[in-house]
């Protein structure tokens, strides 16, 4: 009878490479040898060429997804195929609906969709979750978040608190940061000179988060001011501050489509589509250098959508979720489509060189009373993380006794 100890190193690595990422934690406990392989992240070369693993939001549920682009752009005229294998996650995700998700370093920060909004951080690799108690102010529907880490690899959560004081007739914006090591929130002394739209989720890179933002201008009732173009803005989790404005590779204004995505932990990608209905081109750029206060861009793709869907086709300016495959020279853009007055669906548009466009339907999507639903959100390829985020026992009790 063959024992696990009898298996060759190559065979073990091949077996482990086929384990779903959401099941890695359970497999690690099988034996010490397998656990060591996982800790060293020794995965076979076959995995490097396999379809990448990602997470996607669908019907307010977090799902795992393998988006197989093999066969796309066949030059021999053969049948194209795209296999977006989507599987709803089990565990505690069966009990809650999720409205927003943010990721960094293999950790997922989830915002629940319920009257009493909650935050939870999940490490899919270790199978650990951690509920994040709010600070002095309860979580609100339009709060914005980012997750990252500092130079000491200490993980933190940034929170934007935006609210309107009707007595003062003024909108306030405050920033808080949560430190995993101290299990507490702190208010940051930041006087924003910029505005970041609520639908801009940002992109994580090297522990920091980058946003599309515009200069903040105080408008007078009778005054007329030109609308400032958007810029790139980085939040540094080490200094716990925002940097200076950095250039985007295009002029982006309100109602233009603009979104960011990260490529592993090395590059940013930016998607742009002008809001002018006479212009239907989609542009994607990739950074060649990305630091807190320095950035440079190279063009990646430019595709005209008019020949396929007409001049009026526009991606959602409040969505813009996408990822790219540099090797295949492809981009996959996620879209919330209105297929009728009462029917909505999630879809992806695969775009490539020489005007290539292919739509892949992902199924029906829910709509709320206003007809608006956050579109599907997909992240770059997931990389397992060994970051421990076990729930701190007694933390909630300590807060209640304060």
From Swiss-Prot:
Q: Which domain of life is it from?
A: Eukaryota
Q: CDD domains annotated for this entry?
A: F-box_AtFBW1-like
Stretches that traverse the bilayer: none
One Pfam family it belongs to: FBA_1
Stored InterPro entries: F-box-assoc_dom_typ1, F-box-assoc_interact_dom, F-box-like_dom_sf, F-box_dom, Gal_Oxase/kelch_b-propeller, SCF_F-box_component
What the entry lists under Gene3D superfamilies is as follows: 1.20.1280.50
Q: Which NCBIfam families match?
A: F_box_assoc_1
Name of protein: Putative F-box protein At3g20030
The F-box domain is annotated at: 1-56
């Amino acid at each position: 009878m063959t024992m696990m100890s009898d298996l060759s190193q190559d065979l073990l690595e091949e077996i482990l490479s086929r384990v779903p990422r959401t099941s890695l934690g359970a497999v690690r406990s099988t034996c010490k040898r397998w656990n060591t392989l996982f800790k060293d992240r020794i995965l076979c070369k076959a995995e490097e060429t396999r379809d990448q693993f990602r997470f996607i939001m669908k019907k307010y549920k977090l799902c795992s997804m393998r988006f197989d682009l093999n066969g796309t752009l066949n030059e021999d005229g053969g049948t194209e195929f795209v296999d977006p294998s989507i599987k709803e996650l089990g565990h505690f995700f069966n009990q809650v609906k999720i409205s927003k998700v943010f990721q960094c370093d293999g950790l997922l920060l989830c915002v629940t969709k319920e009257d009493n909004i909650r935050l939870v951080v999940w490490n899919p690799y270790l199978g650990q979750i951690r509920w994040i108690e709010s600070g002095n102010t309860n979580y609100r529907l339009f709060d914005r978040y980012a997750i990252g880490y500092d130079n000491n690899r200490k993980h933190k959560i940034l929170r934007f608190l935006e609210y309107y004081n009707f007595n003062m007739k003024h909108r306030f914006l405050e920033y808080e940061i949560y430190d995993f090591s101290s299990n507490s929130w702190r208010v940051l002394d930041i006087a924003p000179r910029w505005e970041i739209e609520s639908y801009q989720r940002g992109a994580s890179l090297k522990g920091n988060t980058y946003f599309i933002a515009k200069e903040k201008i105080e408008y007078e009732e009778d005054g007329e001011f030109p609308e400032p173009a958007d810029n790139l803005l980085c939040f540094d989790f080490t200094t716990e501050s925002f940097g200076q404005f950095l250039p985007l590779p295009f002029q982006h204004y309100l109602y233009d489509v603009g979104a960011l995505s990260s490529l592993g932990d090395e590059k940013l990608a930016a998607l742009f589509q002008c809001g002018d209905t006479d212009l239907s081109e989609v542009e994607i750029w990739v950074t060649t250098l990305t630091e807190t206060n320095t950035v440079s861009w190279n063009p990646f793709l430019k595709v005209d959508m008019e020949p396929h869907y007409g001049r009026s086709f526009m991606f959602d300016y409040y969505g813009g979720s996408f990822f790219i495959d540099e090797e295949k020279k492809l981009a996959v853009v996620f879209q919330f489509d209105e297929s009728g007055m009462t029917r909505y669906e999630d879809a992806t548009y695969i775009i490539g060189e020489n005007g290539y466009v292919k739509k892949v339907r992902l199924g029906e999507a829910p709509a709320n009373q206003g007809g608006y639903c956050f579109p599907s959100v997909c992240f770059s390829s997931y990389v397992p993380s060994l970051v421990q985020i076990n729930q701190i026992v007694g933390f909630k009790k300590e807060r209640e006794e304060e």
